[in-house]
Amino acid sequence: MAEKKADKRAEKRKFNTEAWEPKTQIGRMVKEGTISDISYIMDKGLPLLEPEIVDALLPDLEEQVLDVKLVQRMHKSGRRARYRATVAVGNKNGYVGVGMGKSKEVGPAIRKAIAHAKLSLIKVRVGCGSWECGCGSPHSIPFAAKGACGSVKVELLPAPRGVGLVAGNVAKAVLGLAGVKDAWTKTFGDTRTTFNFAEATFDALNNLNFVRCLPNQKEKLGLTEGRVL
């Protein structure tokens, strides 16, 4: 019975490409089948302006709500309260995104955060950069990286196979959705702020893409970008 309900929920969540009416040129190219791989969009530096593009090209994308909080701001008529949701999305195979959404209700806030996370999707570099391992398989990160958001700073370090994700719950969720299985982390600042913590981890993963490597170094580190086949 539980399996049938899970299958029905999966069918409801399945993206219907035929019913989708794209608003941008890239969206139309995706629907027509001209673009069939999201890595093409990212390699060309084309803008992701519709979350439906990600739904169509990455059907195995998973979502995880990291935090929902009630926030307030002052207005001339008094205090105004809204819900703020922080969400991470990823396919556990080289793609990850982090987003935040606000609304008067929890549901719309989470949906806004999911859409924002899909639009901020990046390709993640994975590999084996630990001197203790050197297996050459893409289970960790290829080299150390740093990221920051607000007062939070995160440093990611390659770890040997079997160590797992030595990180806080928020960083562990982001790294797991990115497809990183083994890594050490160092954190500084007020990590209780969930969005800043998630965004700093996301920034560190993004900074991996700006390191230049020679072909022989890529082979030694087992460096892979995006989806691992």
UniProtKB/Swiss-Prot annotation:
GO molecular function: rRNA binding; structural constituent of ribosome
One of the Pfam families matching this protein, by short name: Ribosomal_S5
The keyword Protein transport belongs to this UniProt entry's keyword annotation: no
UniProt GO cellular component terms: cytosolic small ribosomal subunit
GO biological process assignments: translation
UniProt superkingdom: Archaea
Protein role: With S4 and S12 plays an important role in translational accuracy.
UniProt record similarity statement: Belongs to the universal ribosomal protein uS5 family.
Subunit structure: Part of the 30S ribosomal subunit. Contacts protein S4.
Domain comment in the entry: The N-terminal domain interacts with the head of the 30S subunit; the C-terminal domain interacts with the body and contacts protein S4. The interaction surface between S4 and S5 is involved in control of translational fidelity.
Protein known as: Small ribosomal subunit protein uS5
Gene field: rps5
